[in-house]
Amino acid sequence: MHVGNDVVDLRDPSNQPDAIHPRFDARAFTASELRELCGSASPHRRRWTLWAAKESTYKAAKKLDPTVRFFPREFVVEGLDEEGAEVHHSAGRFIVRLRHCDEWVHAVATPRSRLGRRRSVITRSPWPGSAEVRSIERARGNPSEVARDLAMDSIASGMAVARKDVELEARGRIPEVRMRDAQLRVDLSLSHDGQYVAWAWAGTRHP
């Protein structure tokens, strides 16, 4: 399972309505998405939820097709609600699971199964791995490194393997998980914004 994730710090100064480019919305969103944004009771959160859905889908799509580039309007968000959305792109259809609070929004995207299950059923199903957000307000160091270390801790715990045996390599900008002895099929995505880091991984361990 290919996975992509994105976190947005809703309180970060650079993400506030008066800080973004005046044409940001027009460049990022389709006509239907703009109508939804204009009609939203919470346009600030709606804006960054749409964005996180697109960004997380891009990360998942890039793993399927390395030639995919991030042109936000080409990632079309449909059926957005509190729990998730479906995103359409030339690379395929993707299901996005959403979590949010007053401080952040977190999106996790995976390719849509051909089994035909409803999106609402998929987003409510148990996640085969871990998807978490952590504050780094008091942490020191590079947020990318913090996200990586926390994700590796999570993978080791979730897969019941020794933390020292979990290794992370980069293929381009895509993280890949390696093990010394055990065979793992793990797909990992990392993200950070403002005071938050996030990760999502899915996988299984072979006996």
Question: In which residue ranges do the predicted regions lie?
Answer:
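Core catalytic alpha/beta fold that binds nucleotide/phospho-ligands
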Residues: M1-P207
